[in-house]
């Protein structure tokens, strides 16, 4: 077997192995995300403070109704799920995901949270996702068989307390 054929065979095997292991977490269209909780009072009112506590932010539907949305606020494709979970050794870290199910990929089919397990689930395809400890990875349903994970967003600490969520 020639050197080129051996390299080609190795490259093919490598691609097959790595493609089976990766989770596709970019199925949701790239829509702007910016939610400003940059002062401590706003974070104390609308943030998440204990493991499994969550909130949904959907600007077009005014959820939550009394949140101070501005012209500079953007809540992604299907809305933003903000949940407190584990990041490293910290079990009280704010984590953010798009609310749209990556299997359905429609902005009006939104995930819900199971209050017993703190897993996100899709009411249409019934896929379930680990949003507290595994970066929105699929754990059952069609999302697992297709390796579709949730679109994650960045949660950055703000200078004056609180956080800012961005894409």
Predicted feature locations:
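Bacterial N-terminal signal peptides that target proteins for export
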Residues: 1-8
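Processing junctions and N-termini across compartments
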Residues: 14, 95, 116-119
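C-terminal motif of bacterial Sec signal peptides marking the signal peptidase cleavage site
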Residues: 15-19
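N-terminal pre-ligand scaffold of iron-sulfur
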Residues: 23-114, 130, 151-167
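Surface-exposed intrinsically disordered loops and tails
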Residues: 64-69, 135-139, 143-144
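A mature extracytoplasmic/lumenal domain signature
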Residues: 98-100, 124-126, 135
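Cysteine-rich micro-motifs
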Residues: 117-127
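Short metal-binding segments enriched for Cys and/or His
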Residues: 128-141, 155
